[in-house]
Swiss-Prot record:
Component of the small ribosomal subunit. Identified in a IGF2BP1-dependent mRNP granule complex containing untranslated mRNAs. Part of the small subunit (SSU) processome, composed of more than 70 proteins and the RNA chaperone small nucleolar RNA (snoRNA) U3. The lineage of its organism: Eukaryota, Metazoa, Chordata, Craniata, Vertebrata. Residues 8-26 have a biased composition (Basic residues). Gene3D superfamilies: 3.10.290.70. This is Small ribosomal subunit protein eS8. The gene is rps8. Residues 1-27 are annotated as: Disordered.
Length: 208
C-alpha cells in the first residue's frame, strides 16, 4: 500500500464507514519523509507533478546562515541539532527540518567581524594571535582608513549572550529552509528575545 493523502479512507463524522468510490490516484500520493541527517552532502532529485523537481536532502553538513543585526551571511558548518519545538525524537536522531535549532560554527562570522571592525571577538584574554590575525587586528592604517574604522566601531557592540557563544566557537541558529523539499539547510543566527527564549527552553530540557 502506497502512502496516500486522501480523506476517503477515514470514517464519517458519525462513525460510519465510507465505501471507496475509486482506486488511489496519482495526485493523492504521498512520499516518505526525508529525515535529513548531518553528514557529507547527499541529495536525491525527485520528479514531481508538472514535471518539476524537488531536491530531497538525505544528508547535509553546511548551510547559509545570516547574522541579521550585522547584515552578514556566511556559509558555515552545521555541528549539532539541539532543540525542536515539534518533536524531541528529531533532536535525538539529529534530524534537520525547518525551524529546528542547530549549533553552527562561528568562525566565518568572527573572521568577518574582525576584518570589518578591526576588533577582536570571542577571544580569551591574552590569547596568542596568528600572524594573519595580528595583521588584521593590529595593522598600521592611514588616518583616513582609521577614521572609517572608528566610525564603524560606534555600532560594533554585540550582546553578551552572543559574545559568550563566540567564546565557545558555536552559535545557535534556526533553519528556515525546508531541507527535504529544496535540498538546503539555510537559516539565521538567533539573537535578542528569540535567543533568550530558546536558551531557556534548552536549559529546561537539560534540567529534566
Amino acid at each position: 500500500m502506497g502512502i496516500s493523502r486522501d480523506n476517503w479512507h477515514k470514517r464519517r463524522r458519525t462513525g460510519g464507514k465510507r465505501k471507496p468510490v475509486h482506486k488511489k490516484r496519482k495526485y493523492e500520493l504521498g512520499r516518505p519523509a526525508a529525515n535529513t541527517k548531518i553528514g557529507p552532502r547527499r541529495i536525491h532529485t525527485i520528479r514531481v507533478r508538472g514535471g518539476n523537481k524537488k531536491y530531497r536532502a538525505l544528508r547535509l553538513d553546511v548551510g547559509n546562515f545570516s547574522w541579521g543585526s550585522e547584515c552578514c551571511t556566511r556559509k558555515t558548518r552545521i555541528i549539532d541539532v539541539v532543540y525542536n519545538a515539534s518533536n524531541n525524537e528529531l533532536v535525538r536522531t539529529k534530524t534537520l527540518v525547518k525551524n529546528c535549532v542547530v549549533l553552527v560554527d562561528s568562525t566565518p562570522y568572527r573572521q568577518w567581524y574582525e576584518s570589518h571592525y578591526a576588533l577582536p571577538l570571542g577571544r580569551k584574554k591574552g590569547a596568542k594571535l596568528t600572524p594573519e590575525e595580528e595583521e588584521i587586528l593590529n595593522k598600521k592604517r592611514s588616518k583616513k582608513v582609521q577614521k572609517k574604522f572608528t566610525l564603524r566601531r560606534k555600532t560594533a557592540k554585540i550582546s553578551p549572550l552572543l559574545e559568550e557563544q563566540f567564546l565557545q566557537g558555536k552559535l545557535l541558529a534556526c533553519i528556515s529552509s525546508r531541507p527535504g523539499q529544496c535540498g538546503r539547510a539555510d537559516g539565521y543566527v538567533l539573537e535578542g528575545k528569540e535567543l533568550e527564549f530558546y536558551l531557556r527552553k534548552i536549559k529546561a530540557k537539560k534540567g529534566k
